[in-house]
């Protein structure tokens, strides 16, 4: 194992990062009235289209139907993505991030808990954004809204009153994400573990795709769902480490994850953080939405036909 990972794993074992980044439904319920605690619903829907691609839409209607008491809806595709980009879910500027989360009543010193009523990847994407801008205390509700409901906890409907706040002046940590040119350069240099977080089917080149089927040549397949239990809670730290070990992630100098548009790929990044690993890890933000459109950037298709 590369020493850069071993040092972080050793430190993580001493501080228990799972307690820092995950919260159970029962623990959240006991703290809902705590000063400085803000709960965000990141629900988004992603659906295959007839042309073989994908369409996405905010889950605001889901939020209006049911949400954790006091939670605010946070629009990943709208307020928390770069409106000037031709790609969905592109990282916003520091100013846009501060305005958007400030409008939800969040300040830089608040404790933020994020959940989704659909796939956890929407919550991990929002968690990653907060960490990208240096927010210190941000957690995921383990198991999402389904776990909250399974615990028999209270649900609200309708809109939640917003009280805007001044977030502050965050600094975007640009070493936490890369573009396609950086992938090409780092693959050529060596020492990179590139992880595809889409389904095995999509990795092979079957089913819906982002312009060209298949995966970036040289990347490993670790589907986002493989990091989770059946109830959508995160697997144990030992299981997560073994899962990443299986593709040789810790034998390389750097880990970069990608998917279709920078959403599912935040699940392995969050899983690494649960092990105490955040240094040397980056997200390919635009992922295959960018890569597949570049005809001379190498892709591999394992499916026949």
Task: List the model feature ranges, each with a label.
Residues 1-305:
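Cytosolic catalytic domains that perform sulfur/thiol-centered chemistry
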